[in-house]
Every structure is written in structure tokens, then in C-alpha cells.
């Protein structure tokens, strides 16, 4: 499983590992800003896309909108992982599959199904 995260302040891979998620069978990549987000998504072709809302220069919600309007294949799972529940709700309404406070992403069932 390939996981791509756009998050500017928290090391998501370290957070997952620190909370007991086995990433040994996953390919994980994180970008700390959202420059060229569509090209990055296209090149990496993730199964799981994780989006922080408050991230420069393009917010996670706008990354999601741009992805859904593009011809790029939609990842199997899109996770909204803002520290703001309102931002997560906005991304869920737009097309994200899960909305969770970023510090709880290790609790998602996707890690047990794919690891």
C-alpha cells in the first residue's frame, strides 16, 4: 500500500510508528507543503492520501477539490486529518472518506486492513 501525506508540521510517519502502526509493508511519503500537489499525487499514485487542511500554499480542502476536478485517478482512501474538526467536516463533505484529528490517525482501521 502506498501512502502519501500532505502535512506541514507533524511527522506523520513517526506519529504512526510511535503509536504502534506497522509500516514495514507500506510505502510512505510525506510532503511538508502542497506545492505542485497534483503532479506529486500523479507521480506517487497513492492508495491512501492524507490531507492536512491548514498547509501552505494550498489548503488540504483545495488540494482535494483540485484532485476531484482533475483527470488523476482518485486514491482508494482519502483521509482529512486536520486538528480542526470543522476543517475535517468540510473535507468529508467534499469527498474525503475519513475525517480525524491528526494526532489520532493511528486509530484508523485502514492500518490493520493493509499492514
Model-identified regions with their sequence ranges:
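C-terminal output helix
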Residues: 104-114
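Conserved phosphotransfer microenvironments
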Residues: 50-69
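A generic structural motif
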Residues: 21-29
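Conserved acidic segment of CheY-like receiver
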Residues: 1-12, 16-20
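Hydrophobic/aromatic residues positioned on beta-strands within the core alpha/beta folds
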Residues: 79-81
